[in-house]
């Protein structure tokens, strides 16, 4: 897939990508891989625990993940470009998003670059998508999600889908990534779309 996605007025689509320490690091990795293939400019910030999770759950190093992004930033760099509302971006995705980061974003703590960038999305009314990872959920988690939803945030838990009859773990992960990119109008031809149960059976 080599097609580049452009803004309506021209120019590359620009997205901020955050990765936290929640389980599911592969969602962030595959997201970056697909965004790179789509020609999207990405600005990546990785939390310290995300670095640990990447090493534990995937076969990638932090350096390899950072190389998938167009630009990378330290989580400590509160003076980075993405910390300002004047930075030109089309939105932000946090994949995966821990409950700690969810709470920080909801309360506007902005205690690191990742949560500050998310806070910027909220104040600038730009699209913010959180792939929240936790189960079961307690009342605090649910109230944080509800509050952010009321602020315009898209809560997109990376739940596996089986109606498209995935044949591998990678297909299940990619389905979530494609649904995430749909939120920004990035509709990849590789994404399987539901066309009704009979057609789905026939195409299996």
Swiss-Prot record:
Homododecamer. Belongs to the UbiX/PAD1 family. YclB subfamily. The keyword Flavoprotein applies. It is not known, if phenolic acid decarboxylase forms a complex composed of BsdB, BsdC and BsdD. The term subunit is often used in reference to the operon, however there is no experimental evidence to prove the existence of the complex. The keyword Disulfide bond does not apply. Induction: Up-regulated by salicylate via the transcriptional regulator BsdA. Its EC number is 2.5.1.129. SUPFAM superfamilies: Homo-oligomeric flavin-containing Cys decarboxylases, HFCD (SSF52507). GO terms for biological process: catabolic process; response to toxic substance. InterPro entries: Flavin_trans-like, Flavoprotein, UbiX-like, UbiX_pad_YclB. Keywords: Aromatic hydrocarbons catabolism, Detoxification, Flavoprotein, FMN, Prenyltransferase, Transferase. It catalyses: dimethylallyl phosphate + FMNH2 = prenylated FMNH2 + phosphate. Disruption phenotype: A triple bsdB-bsdC-bsdD deletion mutant no longer converts vanillin to guaiacol, the conversion stops at vanillic acid. GO terms for molecular function: carboxy-lyase activity; flavin prenyltransferase activity. Pfam families: Flavoprotein. It is an enzyme of class 2 (transferase). This is Probable UbiX-like flavin prenyltransferase. FMN binds at residues 21-23, 47, 98-101, 133. It comes from Bacillus subtilis (strain 168). Involved in the non-oxidative decarboxylation and detoxification of phenolic derivatives under both aerobic and anaerobic conditions. Flavin prenyltransferase that catalyzes the synthesis of the prenylated FMN cofactor (prenyl-FMN) for phenolic acid decarboxylase.
